[in-house]
């Protein structure tokens, strides 16, 4: 299974693809929206939708979906075909800017945190143009153009995890720009970035199928300790078994095709535990990619005779699976605000930014930072 240069990012409607397929004026206006939140004209949206549809069709896509993150901690999608009836018994393929920007899925069966009744069905998905669309292939099924979106109620309340994330990124941007003005600096934007490491367990499928608790809950609920655990620290960074290495190779190929910058892979501390880590990216994009990564982990594991466990503590007595987040904030002209420099104790800008973050954590998580009696 060879990975060629043409495979890298081929299923992602990334900036390079947009630049190549969109008229220059359209690409320029879309970039203003992506980078600085400028309003998106309907004509621009129509042009983007046409280019996105043609690109997806070339990859074999027959359907599209507004892909979002409801409060289930999973992703959600409803597939609509590109086919529209003309009226004389024939069909045309169509995908408009209106369909790209907004859809109205039934929100009554999604959790809402108690903010509305079940009969309040209407929900809206709205395109997050800052996160690249991608084409997902369903084994033995259709190929689907997935458009990252937010999910809100008719009255504007957030019904997903992504809307608060985007709002928090906007708040960080505004306050960071305010602080930087005190130092005489005037960048146009400050962006939060994150590189989430993903730990997971691979269990042989025949062993997995013998455990009803693993099948139903993704973790063991009872059982004896393993004959050999992690006492010798010989699993961590150890030689990767051939079967696992084959799985990782197939996983990387799929991730690279999606444009996910998977970089590092290794054995973790516990037996049968492993890790994959991508290069950091803009926070909402990295979050979308992590959801897609977890879905891909499970699918590739299935194809290779494994079950992939993503539960944070699937086995007692050995390490659980964390998701370390390498987080930072950076200006649009390339300055990392959490870079301490050679003399951090004299770097007033770094100290102020760090103090603001510590203060925010202290205020938000008082129960974790203050002693209890």
What does each model-identified segment do?
Residues 123-252:
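ATP/Mg2+-dependent ligation/transfer catalytic cores
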Residues 149, 232-235, 273-283, 327:
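Short, hydrophobic beta-strand segments
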Residues 213-223, 285-304, 329-361:
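Helical (often loop-to-helix) elements that flank the catalytic cores of nucleotide-handling enzymes
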Residues 228-258, 289-308:
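Substrate-binding cleft of carbohydrate-active enzyme catalytic domains
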Residues 317, 321-335:
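Flexible glycine/proline-rich, aromatic-decorated loop/lid segments
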Residues 7-122:
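Active-site core of metal-dependent hydrolases
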Residues 366-372:
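Conserved small/polar residues in nucleotide/adenosyl-binding loops
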Residues 198, 268-276, 321-323:
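Short, conserved phosphate-binding/catalytic loop or strand-edge motifs used
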């Amino acid at each position: 299974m060879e990975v060629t240069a043409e495979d890298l990012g081929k299923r992602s409607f990334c900036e390079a693809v947009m630049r190549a397929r969109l008229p220059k004026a359209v690409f320029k206006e879309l970039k203003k929206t992506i980078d600085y939140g400028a309003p998106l004209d309907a004509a621009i949206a129509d042009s983007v939708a046409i280019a996105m549809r043609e690109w997806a069709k070339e990859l074999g896509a027959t359907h599209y979906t507004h892909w979002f993150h409801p409060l289930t901690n999973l992703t959600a999608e409803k597939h609509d075909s590109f086919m529209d009836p003309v009226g004389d018994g024939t069909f045309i393929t169509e995908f408009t800017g209106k369909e790209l920007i907004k859809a109205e899925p039934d929100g009554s069966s999604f959790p809402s945190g108690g903010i509305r009744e079940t009969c309040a069905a209407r929900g809206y998905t709205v395109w997050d143009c800052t996160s690249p669309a991608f084409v997902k292939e369903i084994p033995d099924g259709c190929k689907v153009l997935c458009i990252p979106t937010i999910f809100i109620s008719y009255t504007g309340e957030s019904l997903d995890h992504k809307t608060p994330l985007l709002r928090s990124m906007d708040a960080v941007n505004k306050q960071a720009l305010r602080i930087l003005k005190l130092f005489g600096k005037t960048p146009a934007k400050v962006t939060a970035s994150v590189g989430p490491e993903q730990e997971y367990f691979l269990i042989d499928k025949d062993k997995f199928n013998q455990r009803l608790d693993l099948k139903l809950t993704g973790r063991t609920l009872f059982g004896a300790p393993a004959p050999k655990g992690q006492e010798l620290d010989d699993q961590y960074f150890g030689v990767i078994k051939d079967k696992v290495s084959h799985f990782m190779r197939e996983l990387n190929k799929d991730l690279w095709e999606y444009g996910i910058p998977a970089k590092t892979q290794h054995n973790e501390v516990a037996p049968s535990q492993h890790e994959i880590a991508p290069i950091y990216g803009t926070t909402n994009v990295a979050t979308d990619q992590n959801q897609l990564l977890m879905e891909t982990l499970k699918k590739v594991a299935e194809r290779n005779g494994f079950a992939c466990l993503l539960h944070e503590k699937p086995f007692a007595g050995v390490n659980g699976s964390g998701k370390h987040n390498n987080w930072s904030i950076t200006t649009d002209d390339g300055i990392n605000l959490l870079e301490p420099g050679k003399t951090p104790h004299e770097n007033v800008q770094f100290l102020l930014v760090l103090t603001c973050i510590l203060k925010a954590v202290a205020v938000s998580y008082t129960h974790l930072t203050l002693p209890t009696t």
